[in-house]
Amino acid sequence: MGETMIDRFAKAFSYLLIAPAVLPLIYVSGLVFPYVAIKIFLLWGLGIIACAIFVFLALSGRPFFYARLRNPLSWIPFALLAVAYFTSVSGLDFYHSFWGLFERGDGLLTSTIITIFFYLILLTADRAFFNRLSKVVAVVAGLVATVAVLQWVTAVLGGRVWFLPPVSGRIGSTFGNAAFLAGYLGVALFVILFVLRDAIGEWRRIFMIATILSVFAILFTATRGTILALLVSLIIALVYSAWKGEGGVRRFSRYGLIAAVGIGALFFGFRSQLAQVPFEPIQRIASISLSDGTVSSRLFVWQHIGEEALKRPWNGYGAENIAKLFDKVYDPSQIIEQWFDRSHNAFLDYFVQYGIFGLLLYLALIGAFLASALRLYCQYPPGLMNPGLLFSLLILTYAMQNFFVFDTPHSLWLVYALFALLIVLSKEDPSESFPLKRQPVFVSSSMSSIILLALIPTVVLPLYANILLTKGYLLHVIDVKAANVYFERGLTLGTFADLEYGYQAYSMYADHQAVQLFGTDRIAAYEYARSVLTANFKKYPYDARTATYLGHVLDTAPPEVAVDDAFEQQVLSRAIDFSPLRAQAWYMMANISLRKADALPQNDEGRERYFREAIGVLEAYAQKEPMLPVPRYTLAALYYKLGNAVMAKKWADEAYPLYTTPDMVAAGPAVKYYLAIGDWQHAVRFLADMVADDPTNYDTLYDLAKVTYLAGDPAAAERIVETIRKKDPALLETDQNFLIAITAYEQSKK
């Protein structure tokens, strides 16, 4: 192979190092799930290919900047990665730590690839590469922001544009997640400003528009961590300019600081009113307080996960094992998320996973980035657009937003790439050839080929498994057999996707198949979900999520299928052991006894014994979790069914003051109890919440009309009946007694 081919590889190598900057723009619908998956597969693939080409070029005698490795700052990423591997080997599950999950895209493999990119850029880049990469990042960030703004506009107008990713909740652009989007743009915004600094002509206008769109996109995500971080960075920039600036810029900055103080005072003075403004970013920021549900949930998670982390301060728990601690400390009365694998604080995440040394190295990485940016600052005249100042603000924004959210692979890759480039700009060394003599083509080609083979287990097979999972998902209701064929093919590939296959199997069965399918289709769906979750139950014995999901699938088995109660109890016992305050496993444990009671004749004495077994389970849970109304209303209903009105009232009276916000899980048993005892006033409250949650459920609306009438408010009942006459008039004929009564009331008003 001649020099010409080596030159071609060298040129391709330069493009490969820039290629990850384009990944945030990649969006594929209907092929893989979630959005981040295709980006991660491409990142892994690009990293492996770039590594293979580097080895080929290095062994072929191609010169690189090896002297840069003498810079002590350059070894921080390697040290952090080494600590991550060490703590994961001694952690809970190295296999899961290495691969992670589709839905997150993190893990040791991702960290390894990002670290490889850091060193490849460090050994290769020059100032021209820095400029090219910065322009690519600026253009891509501008396009991602454009998609986000268009999403927001179409959502406000109530439309849908075919080429835009669908919006579910807050806008997420091509990331499909508002926090991912805001975290990326919060860092990329300063790269856009850096490129804008020297841009001229049309490009200058383009980057000005990209800057504006990025700010709006971040605002529209309503991600408070990033918004607050940017506001703090803006204040720092204004203080700097008011101190170091000259002429009009200095004067403008001082006025800006005065305006910021005034706006801040007005904001805090009218915070309660601003919290009602129909604009989500302002609402979310104005609602920040210790009593805010999200804030109190975060603080609870930080405190309790931090306490668990202090039990293993040196070794940590290993990468991607935060979910185990989350499950352990989970309290449904305190935490919003059902399942989560992050603490919403990147610094705490590093401490939990990698121990104190991992946290210190992460802080050292941020500090080294800042130190390198400040060295760059000294190379340019002072001013707001000084590159060193911009990159200092970038890393400060990154650190501040990560205190409130979690890091993402794309933000981390960008920070690593820029860190390498800052080291490059601080001191440029002459190229040096690889210290070994130039190897034969066979050696360099063989080594590169071996590295490329890693693409098969790391990218090709997991990607194919993801595609098969997506294909099956698209068919899981309309053609269960075909869907199961795709799922089984995906599982036979033997990839790390098996855990996620189990999660998706549960979601498909519990959310759709169990309620929409019947007969053999439902049985087939159940058997698949049960089999994959059972396999994962054995393979991942520490996973409370798998145990809970398997228990729920067994609890909702088709009536034609016999369930092994002993196995279900074993499954639910494990779920309770690993997440003792999670309600679902306790309820399902009680359901085992209730199913046995329902299988007996009404006059069978054994029914009471099974009812009391269920009551014992729920009372044990109610004692552990004193703030939930659901188990108490369920106990009230069970005691009432046993004829013990005194105990029923005791539990209902305990439950009622705990019902502070609408909760459909609690409203159901509450309505049953209050209807049974004829307490119409209390029943109205819960039925009203159920109607507000699902206004199209006219059966519930009709129940509300009847109970409202019985509660002594026939006027309100009449208004509800008028709505039903317009929406579903036939429903009124189902209760002739009420129809006669409300008709008589209407006629009495004439």
Regions found by a protein language model. Name each.
Residues 15-25, 141, 209-212, 345, ...:
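Loop-to-helix entry and N-terminal half of a specific, functionally important transmembrane alpha helix
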Residues 177, 290-292, 297-340, 347, ...:
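TM-adjacent membrane-interface loops and short helices in multi-pass inner/ER membrane proteins
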